Regions:
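Flexible loop/turn connectors
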Residues: 127-210
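Alpha-helical recognition/docking segments in bacterial nutrient-uptake
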Residues: 1-67, 71, 131
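Short acidic/polar active-site loop segments enriched in Thr and Asp
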Residues: 12, 74-76, 140
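Anion (oxyanion) recognition and catalysis
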Residues: 31-34, 101, 158
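Hinge/beta->alpha junction and helix N-cap segments in small-molecule ligand-binding domains
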Residues: 1, 19-20, 44, 53-64, ...
Length: 210
């Protein structure tokens, strides 16, 4: 419905970011294809000839996260992933497992979101982690596939008396400004978000209808 509203306003282009239901979004866009409005999908790759994709290599991001945690000695690791129905979340998780495997580290615990990543998801993930490990030693590190989720996990751990990184290490994803605004500051995997935005706008401007 939202896409139909945008099209009705004679827009020059559409940039879609953080698509949750990829199948439904693609179908809605294809139904409006005759309007010849340029469409840019940000953050994941969707193989439709009339769409442009601007995305980083999500598999490589996962590998980098796994290799980093493995290289500093972590053997028992947890992660909070995006919704399993999304390709980007699956790619990051596959890469993460492969990166850990290079250091004989184990992905011991996984929390898959059922909705878009946000602060509440991070709190829910940490609650689930604590429930699953009640009376047992926690994994030594957590990779949150979003800095907002990482900040929520940090808050939950701190509230429960755990120290980051002394008791448990925490790694985020995206490298947004929030990482420097929390205590302690978050380690994170960098995403070139400014460059992604600039490239998306460039594509729209070059392909907007006459």
């Amino acid at each position: 419905e939202l896409l139909n509203t945008y099209f009705s306003r004679n827009i020059d282009g559409i940039i879609l970011y953080l698509i949750y239901d990829e199948t439904r979004a693609v179908q809605s866009l294809l139904e409006q294809e005759e309007r010849r409005v340029p469409v840019v999908i940000v953050g994941r790759r969707i193989n439709v000839d009339s769409f442009s994709n601007v995305a980083t290599d999500n598999y490589l991001a996962g590998v980098m996260a796994g290799e980093y945690l493995g290289s500093i000695g972590h053997k028992r690791v947890a992660t909070v992933t995006g919704p399993r129905i999304t390709q980007w979340a699956r790619d990051r998780l596959d890469g993460f497992r492969d990166g850990l495997a290079k250091y004989q580290a184990q992905l011991e615990w996984q929390y898959s979101q059922t909705d878009l990543p946000d602060f509440e998801t991070g709190l829910a993930a940490c609650d689930a982690l604590m429930a699953d490990y009640a009376g047992r030693a926690l994994p030594t590190a957590i990779w949150a596939q979003n800095d907002i989720i990482a900040a929520a996990v940090l808050k939950s751990l701190t509230n429960q008396g755990y120290r980051v990184p002394e008791d448990i290490s925490l790694l985020g994803m995206d490298d947004i400004q929030l990482c420097t605004m929390v205590t302690p500051m978050l380690s994170t995997i960098h995403q070139p978000l400014r460059e992604i935005a600039q490239e998306s706008i460039r594509i729209i401007m070059e392909n907007e209808p006459g």
